[in-house]
């Protein structure tokens, strides 16, 4: 499906437990039109319109939803889909979607889930069959939003979670923050960290004292982003943080 064999073999050697797609700020976009939509990355590659992303270049979305699910199947790993819940990137001047726009995004999520999990007699399952995969791929995780937070996120998160869980109760729901503190259900919280080398070294015990009765933790992104990032010193700082994660997994 268009991916370099040598890179996929290295990925396979890592034996990943799951793959997150697409993840990152491409999910949020920088405008209502650039917010991620499943339908834009479905169907034949040559029919996908692509999108300008917030890093300043155009994504063809040639690696789309089908290719991602096929890669997960080939690697024998679980799939995690990340959807937009009606918010653009909050770091870059957020735009909040209105009611009809939120519903359109929620409908888009259901189309994606049907593509991954529906029978070939369904609308999106039939497209999957025409793309060469008659049987459902399956999907284990759904992450609602990317790096979103605050009351606006919590409201949208709960709307998506409730609707999806009613139809697909088997899906494991991932939140961007600890929404349980606002009284909302979740299975896993996705924590992202970008900081100095020293912060990562000093926080090697970050997870030693987490409440084991709370939600699971998924560190979806972390990196040193301050100072000279191309040094052994930086690598050791990140490694110290990783040791803490491994110790608590």
Regions found by a protein language model. Give the residues of each.
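Extended acidic/polar, glycine-enriched regions
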Residues: 1-13, 102
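Alpha-helical scaffolding within the catalytic cores
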Residues: 5, 62-68, 116-134, 175-180, ...
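Conserved, mostly hydrophobic/aromatic
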Residues: 15, 19, 72, 112, ...
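Short, well-ordered coil/turn segments that N-cap beta-strands
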Residues: 15-17, 75-79, 135-140, 169-172, ...
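Short, solvent-exposed turn/loop segments enriched in Gly/Ser/Thr/Pro and often Arg
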Residues: 20-31, 83-87, 177-179
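Aromatic- and acidic-residue-enriched carbohydrate-binding clefts of CAZyme catalytic domains
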Residues: 27-65, 92-107, 114, 118-143
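Substrate-binding cleft/loops of secretory-pathway carbohydrate-active enzymes
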Residues: 90-97, 104, 133-136, 178-204
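Catalytic-core region of carbohydrate-active enzymes that cleave or remodel glycosidic bonds
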Residues: 163-176, 188-249
């Amino acid at each position: 499906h268009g991916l370099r064999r040598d890179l996929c073999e290295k990925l396979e050697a890592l034996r990943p437990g799951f793959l997150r797609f697409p993840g990152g700020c491409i999910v949020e976009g920088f405008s209502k039109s650039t917010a991620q939509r499943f339908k834009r990355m479905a169907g034949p590659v040559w029919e996908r319109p692509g999108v300008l992303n917030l890093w300043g270049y155009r994504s063809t979305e040639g690696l789309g939803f089908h290719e991602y699910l096929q890669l997960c199947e080939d690697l024998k790993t679980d799939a995690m889909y990340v959807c937009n819940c009606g918010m653009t990137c909050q770091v870059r001047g957020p735009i909040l979607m209105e009611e009809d726009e939120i519903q359109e995004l929620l409908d888009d999520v259901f189309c994606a889930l049907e593509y991954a999990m529906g029978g070939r007699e369904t609308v999106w399952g039939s497209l999957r069959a025409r793309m060469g995969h008659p049987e459902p791929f399956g999907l284990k995780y759904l992450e609602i939003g990317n790096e979103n937070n605050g009351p606006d996120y919590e409201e949208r998160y709960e709307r998506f979670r409730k609707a999806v869980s009613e139809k697909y109760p088997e899906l494991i729901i991932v939140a961007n923050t600890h929404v349980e503190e606002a009284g909302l259900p979740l299975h896993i919280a996705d924590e992202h960290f970008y900081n100095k080398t020293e912060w990562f070294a000093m926080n090697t015990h970050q997870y030693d004292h987490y409440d084991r009765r709370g939600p699971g933790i998924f560190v979806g992104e972390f990196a040193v982003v301050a100072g000279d990032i191309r040094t052994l010193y930086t690598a050791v700082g990140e490694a110290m943080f990783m040791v803490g994660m491994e110790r608590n997994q």
